[in-house]
From Swiss-Prot:
Record family assignment: Belongs to the UPF0260 family.
UniProt-listed NCBIfam families: PRK05170.1-5, PRK05170.2-1, PRK05170.2-5
Protein name from the UniProt record: UPF0260 protein VP2169
InterPro entries according to UniProt: Puta_zinc/iron-chelating_dom, UCP006173
One Pfam entry name: CxxCxxCC
Length: 146
């Protein structure tokens, strides 16, 4: 049995198809982030991009996501050193940090169902910008809250 590509290739040497397949489709990168102006610390919120389908955790207009007017960030090989802002479960970040993929990752399990069952996606856990009054009330990783 051959070694899976994510264990045998660096991110820089993956094909476009391999690169795209690393995304588990959790939807976490589609959550709005807030940055502390004093510390530059990034805080994730449960506020989703308006293009995110909260049931499927996928973009409603994936082919046009970079031109839709939303602030969708394209992950590229040139940005690997900056992947620390990505969720700690993100395959791009994990591989950039020489860490293994989680056991629920679709490349390991063959489907997204294990990821959803493990609670690692944003499925049915988000609100949309239009419903937000105070963004700070939606911070998920607030340092002063349990």
């Amino acid at each position: 049995m051959s070694t899976p590509f994510w264990q045998s290739k660096s991110l820089e040497h993956m094909s476009e198809e391999e690169w795209e397949s690393l995304c588990d489709g959790c939807g976490k990168c589609c959550l709005h982030k807030l940055m502390d102006e004093d510390t530059d610390e990034i805080y994730y919120t449960n506020v989703a991009c308006s293009w995110l389908n909260s049931k499927t955790c996928s973009c409603k207009d994936y082919p046009n996501r970079f031109t839709s007017g939303e602030e969708c960030t394209k992950l590229t090989r040139e940005d690997i050193d900056d992947f620390t802002w990505l969720p700690h479960t993100c395959a791009y970040r994990l591989l950039a940090e020489n860490q293994p993929l989680p056991e629920w990752h679709p490349l390991i399990t063959g489907s997204k169902s294990a990821m959803h069952a493990a609670g690692e996606s944003v499925r049915n856990k988000v609100v949309y910008e239009i419903d937000v009054v105070d963004w700070e009330d939606h911070i998920l990783n607030h340092p002063n809250r349990p």
